[in-house]
Amino acid sequence: VDLFRSMDIPVRTIECCSGDLADLKVKSYDVEAWSPRQKKYFEVGSCSNLGDAQARRLKIRVKGKDGNKYFAHTLNNTVVAPPRMLIAFLENNLNADGSVNIPKALQPYMGGKEKLIPLD
């Protein structure tokens, strides 16, 4: 979420309904970015807690402080789906003249430029 916000992309997290969860998921959140073109949010990533279900299948155990072995709890995350990130970035930073605003977080990597200007 912070990555998207640092790129001046409006973003939100949505807790998924239990009826929408895949087989192993205990809890899941979707990360959604605002699309000015579509005038709605669209999914750009997700974060899911699989409890110990995946670890049971893979026989992944951890030793607890009490010395007993337990099945690990696992997470499944899509931090960034690059094509969706690019779409969200361009849609939220594009100007009417075709130039693209460079967020402050990226300006040091762009030689201090504040905008990308299209070539004629």
Language model region names:
Residues 1-120:
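TRNA-recognition modules of translation machinery and tRNA-sensing kinases, especially anticodon-binding
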